[in-house]
């Protein structure tokens, strides 16, 4: 059998294995504990099988397309189920399966007391299937099905603890912001079906239509909603109300990458459209700076990591904006490892400290939780781009390529400022959570000696150290960037990172025991997330409701209910009363006048 035939066969085999636990729940009751282990084993087997087509592709460099089920025909439009197995899909699928395997094993420890843990695992598996459909889709309809699938599963998993009002509000907020982005996606689908009469990627890219600014703007809007870019970003920090495994899987390594992945998928249309490239660059630059500023003063450990995720997503958008989609994809893959590990480590701390998420109430955990502390330190160093960790192999080329770029200097400048802030908020987590004296109640028993907790974190530690090298070595850039930066400037990047660590540590030491009488405006701006939630979720609805109430009061009450009926009726009654009041009741005078008129008439006739 040829290599090209093995790739689709093994890929579909891994997808079929993932559907087996779902099928099992339809045939029999899934309330037994064995369902959890069957689901985890299915994901593990699918991961092992998915490695084979990935390695075969890297060896042969032959893409594969599967189109084996014709769905329906509408006039001249043929809709079919088709998969595109290229570098992007075959590289991302094993990464998604590996991270899901680790997070499911972590969930056996984190969610062990939840009475509905079987349903939780089923939701995670359904999300994974829809995510794999999204990355392997070969047409817009199938891509949209995966796109909506991950959105629905995100809604269900954020609101998992539906007894909490904040969780329900966060899930609804995520759904509404993503619906705004879906408007752009539907507009893009409508444009392509009107102008090209096809949703197949090959036909769209081969036709290469002109004036694609409108559909690509719709795609950018959709990606901004799904990947939490500026303007549509507030849902991502709020989504931390869900369980930590949900944050680790959906909101750091897979679902939020869907918007960036879709932009990477459409790079053949974007590479010649300077308007879209500039818009993507500026949007990503604003996002990465804004969310980095907001992360500097947050005290919730999960929100700090969530805002750093949004900042890294902005960095990926910047990379796409400077026409380096393969570099953005490399950063997307490497980022998944250490960000999932950071979330699992924070979940370990939160669970051991009785659901405490404030980093000011932690401290001294490097003694009681050494493995978790090691994971947080390695993840933070990888996030800052420390040499020879996973993040270095993608973040350093992005910075170098951006510095050598000659377009939109202000966007590149604020991107570099945002990248330098990464070391500050990473050091802040390490300083407050791991160092110093314990600030949590002494009665809390901290224990991380559980294989379901330690093993996933250990696997992700290995991925955060070694996978960046392997991914970067097998990624061929679409356009070769001009690497003309002098060596001393390259060392300056490392020096700036170390300087950020040093400054953040000194500031934390200096201000640790100080109390601020009145925070500065910049501190308040960062703490309140740039006043964005207050403006969009409080002030604008308040103004809208106030205006609606005033209009309703003025039109309904003052005009209709008051003027039209009571006052108008009173006016009519006054008019009738004035007419009636002219009758004085002087009967003798009336009869005398009547008699005089008759007499005068008779005299005239005579």
Curated annotation (Swiss-Prot):
Entry similarity comment: Belongs to the complex I subunit 5 family.
NCBIfam families, per the entry: NDH_I_L
Any one of the GO BP annotations: electron transport coupled proton transport
Localization per Swiss-Prot or TrEMBL: Mitochondrion inner membrane
Oligomer status and interactors: Core subunit of respiratory chain NADH dehydrogenase (Complex I) which is composed of 45 different subunits.
UniProt topology in membrane: Multi-pass membrane protein
GO MF term set: NADH dehydrogenase (ubiquinone) activity
Function summary: Core subunit of the mitochondrial membrane respiratory chain NADH dehydrogenase (Complex I) which catalyzes electron transfer from NADH through the respiratory chain, using ubiquinone as an electron acceptor. Essential for the catalytic activity and assembly of complex I.
Reactions catalysed according to its record: a ubiquinone + NADH + 5 H(+)(in) = a ubiquinol + NAD(+) + 4 H(+)(out)
EC numbers: 7.1.1.2
Gene field: MT-ND5
Main location: mitochondrion
Protein's name according to its UniProt entry: NADH-ubiquinone oxidoreductase chain 5
Stretches that traverse the bilayer: 3-23, 38-58, 87-107, 124-144, 180-200, 216-236, 244-264, 276-296, 304-323, 328-350, 369-389, 404-424, 460-480, 483-503, 586-606
Assigned GO CC terms: mitochondrial inner membrane
Family matches, as InterPro entries: NADH_DH_su5_C, NADHpl_OxRdtase_5_subgr, ND/Mrp_TM, NU5C-like, Proton_antipo_N
Broad EC category: translocase
Source organism of this protein record: Elephas maximus
Record key words, sorted: Electron transport, Membrane, Mitochondrion, Mitochondrion inner membrane, NAD, Respiratory chain, Translocase, Transmembrane, Transmembrane helix, Transport, Ubiquinone
Top-level taxonomic group: Eukaryota
């Amino acid at each position: 059998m040829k290599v090209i035939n093995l790739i689709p066969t093994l890929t579909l085999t891994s997808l079929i294995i993932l559907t087996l636990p779902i099928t099992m729940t339809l045939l029999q009751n899934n309330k037994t504990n064995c369902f959890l282990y069957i689901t985890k084993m299915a994901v593990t087997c699918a991961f092992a099988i998915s490695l084979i087509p990935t390695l075969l592709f890297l060896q042969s460099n032959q893409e594969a397309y599967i189109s084996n089920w014709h769905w329906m025909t509408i006039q001249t439009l043929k809709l079919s189920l088709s998969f595109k197995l290229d570098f992007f899909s075959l590289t991302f699928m094993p990464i998604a399966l590996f991270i899901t395997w680790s997070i499911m094993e972590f969930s056996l420890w984190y969610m062990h007391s939840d009475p509905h843990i079987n349903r939780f695992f089923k939701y995670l598996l359904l999300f994974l299937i829809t995510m794999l459909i999204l990355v392997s889709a070969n047409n817009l309809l199938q891509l949209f099905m995966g796109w909506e699938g991950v959105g629905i599963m995100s809604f269900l998993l954020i609101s998992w603890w539906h007894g909490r009002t904040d969780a329900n509000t966060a899930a609804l907020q995520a759904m509404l912001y993503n619906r705004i982005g879906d408007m752009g996606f539907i507009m893009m689908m409508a444009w392509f079906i009107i102008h090209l009469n096809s949703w197949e990627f090959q036909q769209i890219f081969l036709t290469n239509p002109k004036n694609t600014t409108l559909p690509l703007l719709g795609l950018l809007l959709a990606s901004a909603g799904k990947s939490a870019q500026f303007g549509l970003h507030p849902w991502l920090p709020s989504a931390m109300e869900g369980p930590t495994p949900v944050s680790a899987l959906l909101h750091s390594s897979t679902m939020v990458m869907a918007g960036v992945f879709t932009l990477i998928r459409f790079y053949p249309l974007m590479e010649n459209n300077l308007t879209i490239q500039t818009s993507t660059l500026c949007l990503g630059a604003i996002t990465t700076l804004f969310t980095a500023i907001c992360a500097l003063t947050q005290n919730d450990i999960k929100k700090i990591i969530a805002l750093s995720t949004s900042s890294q997503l902005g960095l990926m958008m910047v990379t796409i904006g400077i026409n380096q989609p393969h570099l953005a994809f490399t950063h997307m893959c490497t980022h998944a490892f250490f960000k999932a590990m950071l979330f699992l480590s924070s979940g370990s701390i939160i669970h051991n400290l009785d659901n405490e998420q404030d980093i000011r109430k932690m401290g001294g955990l490097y003694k009681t939780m050494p493995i978790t502390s090691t994971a947080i330190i390695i993840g933070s160093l990888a996030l800052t781009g420390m040499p020879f960790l996973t993040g270095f192999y993608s973040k350093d080329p992005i910075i170098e390529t951006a510095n050598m770029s000659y377009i939109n200097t202000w966007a590149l400048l604020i991107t570099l400022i945002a990248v330098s802030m990464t070391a500050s908020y990473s050091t802040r987590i390490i300083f407050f959570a791991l160092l110093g004296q314990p600030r949590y109640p002494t009665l809390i028993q901290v224990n991380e000696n559980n294989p379901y907790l330690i093993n996933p974190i250990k696997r992700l530690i290995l991925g955060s150290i070694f996978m960046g090298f392997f991914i970067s070595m097998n990624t061929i850039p679409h356009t070769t960037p001009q690497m003309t930066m002098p060596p001393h400037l390259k060392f300056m990047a490392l020096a700036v990172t170390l300087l950020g660590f040093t400054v953040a540590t000194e500031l934390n030491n200096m201000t640790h025991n100080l109390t601020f009488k009145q925070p500065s405006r910049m501190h308040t701006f960062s703490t309140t997330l740039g006043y964005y939630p207050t403006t969009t979720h409080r002030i604008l609805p308040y103004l809208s409701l106030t205006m609606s109430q005033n209009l309703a009061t003025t039109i309904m009450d003052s005009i209709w209910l008051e003027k039209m009926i009571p006052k108008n009726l009173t006016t009519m009654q006054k008019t009738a009363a004035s007419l009636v009041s002219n009758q004085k009741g002087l009967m003798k005078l009336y009869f005398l006048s009547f008699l005089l008129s008759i007499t005068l008439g008779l005299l005239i006739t005579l």
